[in-house]
Amino acid sequence: QAQMSAKGIPQIAVVMGSCTAGGAYVPAMSDVTIIVKEQGTIFLAGPPLVKAATGEIVSAENLGGGEVHTRLSGVADYLAEDDPHALALARRAVASLNWDGGGVNHAVRASMAASYDEPLYDAAELLGIVPADTRQPYDIREVIMRVVDGSRFDEFKPRFGVTLVTGFAHLKGCPIG
């Protein structure tokens, strides 16, 4: 993992079962980690070892399931409903990498940016979304949807650190995020 990361090779982990002991490091060190709800688990030691060491009885889901790793620890970036959803999220992650492996030249990239979809929501609505009082909260996603191409925004880690919004989109055909 570390060597591939050092070479700039993106790593995407999809956890559809149990990642235990050394295998738990793979999703933790990946650039994007997707875990399947009530199916995928990530932990260094499973429930039997926890019981043997501490006497505590804990389920695999409560010890290292999707809820734990997408809301509390932040180890996983996306929570998938099932295996097909996990694979769809993985495909979306690949599409948003903005990594061409050296295969796309700048002329091709420029022509790709020449065409784009206008936002689905009117930018004039921004005045009604962003309050004049800078201390008053508002949903930044509403602003993003009125600025980015096709109002498409792929939020990264949507369940972790909910006061912070990060993600990927396109602006006039150019990838941002």
Please state what every model-predicted region is.
Residues Q1, I35-V36, I42-A45, P131-Q136, ...:
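Generic detector of short, locally flexible boundary/turn motifs and exposed helical patches
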Residues Q1-A2, V104-S115, L171-K172, G177:
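Proteins with a high burden of low-complexity, intrinsically disordered sequence enriched in S/T/G/P/A and R
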Residues Q1-G102:
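Conserved catalytic cores of soluble enzyme domains
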Residues Q11, P47, A53-I57, G74, ...:
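Generic preference for well-ordered secondary structure
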Residues S18, E61-G64, M112-S115, D133, ...:
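Residue-level detector of functional hotspots within protein domains
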Residues Y78-I144:
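Terminal amphipathic helices with adjacent charged low-complexity linkers/tails
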Residues Q136-G177:
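Non-catalytic terminal/interface segments that mediate subunit docking, oligomerization
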